[in-house]
Each structure stands twice: as C-alpha cells, then as structure tokens.
Amino acid sequence: AFQEVQKKKWDSPYRDWFHLSFDGDTEYHDGFWYEGWEGHNELVKLNLWNPAVIEHQFNAIRSWVERFGIDGLRLDVAYCLPPEYLKRLRAFAQGLKPDFVLMGETLHGDYNRWMGPELCHSVTNYECYKGLWSSFNSRNMFEIGHSLARQFGPEQWTLYKGAHLLSFLDNHDVD
C-alpha cells in the first residue's frame, strides 16, 4: 500500500492509510511527508482511525486463525496503540476465538492503560526486568521485592492486583 502511495501520491487509493501530507518531504525524498513510528520514517505509521486499515488488519488476523489456528498475538509497541483500537481488536479476535489472547509490549507508565477486560489480556512487565536481573546476578532482592510489592502487594493501593503481567529476564529490546 505504501509503495502505491509513493508511486501515485494523491491519486493512490491508499493515501488515507497513513499519516502523511503532500506539502512536505522526508529524508528519503519521496516527495511527501509521512509520520514514522517514534520518528523512524522507515517504519511508516498506519492510520488506525481509517476503517479500511482496520478491515485489512482484521482480515489478516482472520486468515491466520483459519489457516494456522493461532490463538493469540503479541503486539509490539502496544503502548503506541490507541485504547479504542485495542478494544476493537479484542472484540474482533474474541469473536473469532473466545480464548484468543492479546499480549502487549509496554515499557513504562501505568500498564492498566493497555491491559484490562476490553484491552490486552496482559502486558510486558518492564518495571520488574531490572529487579529480576539484579536478583539473579548480584543477589540484590531489594529491587524486585519493592517492585512486586508495589504491583501486587497486600495493600489496597497496589497497581495490578489480580492481573497477570509477563515478566522476563531477557529479550531483544534489553540486550
């Protein structure tokens, strides 16, 4: 779709699939400006408010469920996805398969913004990454103890009581 926009510009039927303007340019000199993910123009940002984009994505998910029997998705950079989009995605996926799981990658902030009954089932627990690493590598249990108490402790104010976060020791983003 984006190559079609590069070729036909404003005459492309996909021009509304992306955040772009024909009044500017990028470092790639395509003859128009477009928004990239977190400033990376090689990763062109999709317009998730466009019904045609959502339909295209949902059709792809439907085909993966039918052809391969997938029962979940890991959403890279889920923190960039609007909650309204996540709600639509969850409703669609569970309509295909009631036990379909959405796992979102989140870095910082309140994970409840991306996780809940209508959003992702779970998200990555970057807050505990360093504490887990320290507990295994330097026997420092304070960091992980503090983070886990803050997230799941017995107090009423804990952040994620009853939630299931994906904690990890290593991944491709922390090497």
Q: Could you describe each region identified by the protein language model?
A:
Residues F2-K9, R62, E66, D76-Y160, ...:
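Active-site-proximal helices and loops of the catalytic beta/alpha 8
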Residues F68-G69, F168:
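Short loop/turn motifs at secondary-structure junctions
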